């Protein structure tokens, strides 16, 4: 009896890279694959949620984007050491397929797969390809795209798989939407894994100026940085608004399913969650994101009517208040936005990725 095939998954050390990598790992394990995660020391700290059956391989990598002059000089040597280590590991236990999810920690594994001529693919979560995925886009067999359309290098064809989401999100996929009416109104404010200061600055002020009839019915769940939480709590309290403010919500899928409106950054994982559950959104793309990729991520929601996009360059409390008021006072519009979000969802994204992995073994 032959051993189960091995898929090596290479992912960087942020939630945006790790969530879809984890979803693919879980799907492949359920289909009888062996799975190994390749990352660097930073990425290994984010791998705790991966199934215990996933083997871990920590390799040396580095980026020129951070550190001083000496650290930058050491980058080629650290990457080179990582590539050699990855080649040795792959020769000892050769993967059938190598999948990269972006981020500099994927460089050693993707380079080793290229040298050893192992079938390989990348998954790009955002609407504008990151630097590492861009470097490998012409050197892989498949390019899977989480956001559509994705800006790709000339001559490269992408396959729209969507961005895999956590099981807790899938459990609430298409949950019935309760449109805003005369009862209570739930608002969810999320800004990525560490919150977003601009949302902590703007949202409480915007809500405080809403008509009394609407403001007094609001219940807010607001994800804020730990250092901002105290002042955000005080701002809501002074406006008489019921609010739960935390640095991290471990039940975001449930709060998303319960809300009438979500105000969010436009990270790929957040947008995937919003579309799979299906909720109206006000999106505020992170202006400093590489290549302005969050604006690209938000484009499909804006064009379909599922979301309103407010660039940071024009964001103020009044514009945010206006959009909140317009959505929460119009039940028909809010319902249509929720339905439009669902049309963009790819709840089977992990399976689509797994199918591409299997395809590469034939």
UniProtKB/Swiss-Prot annotation:
Compartments, record wording: Cell inner membrane
Membrane topology: Peripheral membrane protein
InterPro entries: GlcNAc_MurG (IPR006009), Glyco_trans_28_C (IPR007235), GlycoTrans_28_N (IPR004276)
GO cellular component entries: plasma membrane
UniProt entry keywords in alphabetical sequence: Cell cycle, Cell division, Cell inner membrane, Cell membrane, Cell shape, Cell wall biogenesis/degradation, Glycosyltransferase, Membrane, Peptidoglycan synthesis, Transferase
HAMAP family: MurG
Function (record text): Cell wall formation. Catalyzes the transfer of a GlcNAc subunit on undecaprenyl-pyrophosphoryl-MurNAc-pentapeptide (lipid intermediate I) to form undecaprenyl-pyrophosphoryl-MurNAc-(pentapeptide)GlcNAc (lipid intermediate II).
The protein's name in its UniProt record: UDP-N-acetylglucosamine--N-acetylmuramyl-(pentapeptide) pyrophosphoryl-undecaprenol N-acetylglucosamine transferase
Gene that encodes it: murG
